[in-house]
A protein has these predicted regions:
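Membrane-helix interface and helix-disruption motif detector
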Residues: 24-48, 106-125, 142-149, 166-185, ...
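C-terminal transmembrane-bundle signature of multipass membrane proteins
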Residues: 4-7, 13-24, 46-61, 181-268
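N-terminal topogenic module of multi-pass integral membrane proteins
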Residues: 1-123
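Alpha-helical transmembrane segments of multi-pass integral membrane proteins
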Residues: 12-19, 87-107, 121-136, 151-168, ...
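Membrane-interface helix-boundary motifs at transmembrane edges
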Residues: 72-85, 113-115, 138-151, 200-209
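Transmembrane helix-loop junctions and nearby membrane-interface residues
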Residues: 20-27, 60, 64-67, 101-112, ...
């Protein structure tokens, strides 16, 4: 149902706007300019944390309502989840995949000036590969769940995000101010879970509602983390991942339809 897809995407957009604003204010006033240590007594860390909780609750409620609609069919395969106009799928796949790949290339070119340059280069290469895999997935989602390349394409974001989580933790572990990088860690964790849930369509274990919830929540966190200070390539990669998660979950939600026969079809 396209209406449900627009509703949850609009909810995520509004929540992300507030989350980004609060995070930007926190970055501006809650950390000392010289040391980077947190300033005591500020309300903005609590505002950001509260916004994350509110986003999780709102998106969970919207997904719960979608799940409990009577006589509903849920997509149970990758082609069913990605069913859309070939033009829409191609434009989304090429644009978002290219953004992720360009972010990886940017990171690769500037990795020499960053902490752990070797890890940054590997991360950049994975981002380029994941961008190409996403574009391929949107251009040819496959006729069956085990179609050649479908599993690899669905697995690439998982590999990218798992490695990025390791890199982020290694780079930030020396920072005593956990709140300075906590949102990024949460965003990467949520995006990793979202990618895992979406990969279930390719692996024959589809869970449409879980995939939609985690994709929307992870996109919210990725957008909320954008005001943080990071390399330009990583910034573009994070924005591209948010776009990819929103696009995938929009298509999946659009393909939740009234069942043709029987009470409920597909996989919730």
């Amino acid at each position: 149902m396209r209406k449900n897809a627009w509703v949850i995407c609009c909810c995520t957009a509004v929540l992300a706007a507030f989350g980004t604003f609060f995070r930007w204010l926190q970055d501006q006033v809650c950390f000392e300019a010289n040391t980077g240590l947190a300033v005591r007594g500020s309300i903005w860390p609590y505002a950001v944390a509260l916004m994350i909780v509110i986003a999780a609750v709102v998106l969970a409620v919207v997904c719960f309502r979608m799940k409990n609609q009577p006589h509903t069919y849920f997509p149970d395969s990758l082609p069913a989840a990605l069913a859309a106009s070939p033009r829409v799928r191609a434009i989304g796949g090429i644009v978002l995949g290219a953004l992720l790949a360009v972010g990886g290339l940017w990171l690769l070119l500037g990795s020499g000036t960053l902490a752990s340059p070797g890890l940054q280069r590997v991360l950049a290469v994975l981002a380029i590969a994941a961008g190409a895999a996403f574009a391929r997935q949107m251009l040819a989602p496959g006729d069956v769940e085990t179609a050649s390349g479908a599993v690899v394409c669905a697995s690439m974001p998982i590999v990218l995000l798992a490695f990025w989580l390791i890199v982020s933790y290694k780079v930030n572990i020396i920072n005593p101010t956990v709140s300075a990088y906590a949102v990024e860690i949460l965003a990467l964790c949520a995006a990793l879970i979202a990618s895992y849930e979406f990969a279930g369509f390719a692996y024959g274990r589809p869970k449409a509602i879980k995939s939609i919830f985690w994709s929307q929540f992870a996109a919210f966190l990725c957008i909320t983390a954008l005001p943080d200070d990071r390399a330009g390539g990583q910034q573009l990669m994070l924005a591209a991942i948010a776009g990819i998660l929103l696009f995938q979950s929009y298509l999946t939600a659009s393909n939740i339809r009234p069942a043709v026969s029987g009470p409920v079809g597909g996989a919730q």
